[in-house]
Amino acid sequence: GAGAKLSANKPLALIFEGYTTLIRGVPDLVLMLLIFYGLQIALNGITDAMGMGQIDIDPMVAGIITLGFIYGAYFTETFRGAYMAVPKGHIEAATAFGFTSSQTFRRIMFPAMMRYALPGIGNNWQVILKATALVSLLGLEDVVKATQLAGKSTWEPFYFAIVCGLIYLLFTTVSNGV
């Protein structure tokens, strides 16, 4: 994504600019519902036209596709910003030493980019962890769904909401330490 946005190929750069603008501008929950139901409708329209049966998308698959699609836009911006933050002198020095473009990227640009990208990658990871709570709306049995069901069956929804929050806090705290 970042390479496409920085590409000299204007149509490709415009497509990815539109993708990141759209994804970053529309709430995650709305996108999740649009992708889950929209993809299902589109696939069933195709299978109906081909005379085949209906397709039911597994909520786990839908959740993975949706989170990947949404947060791909955020990671695209993280890597684009990191690429642009590397001083041009690094590339000039690599050229002066006779590095090929792939050697320049692998030995100079990528390590330098990662210094700038790591804070954004960590932040995106934290947001993805918390966004997994939204996939329960697609019917996926996750932590939120399990605690919601436990709260309904015991008539103690507040207690289980606190438990759910603590579980997510544990996930994010442990992943911060990694």
For every predicted segment, state its role.
Residues 1-178:
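Transmembrane alpha-helices and adjacent helix-loop boundaries
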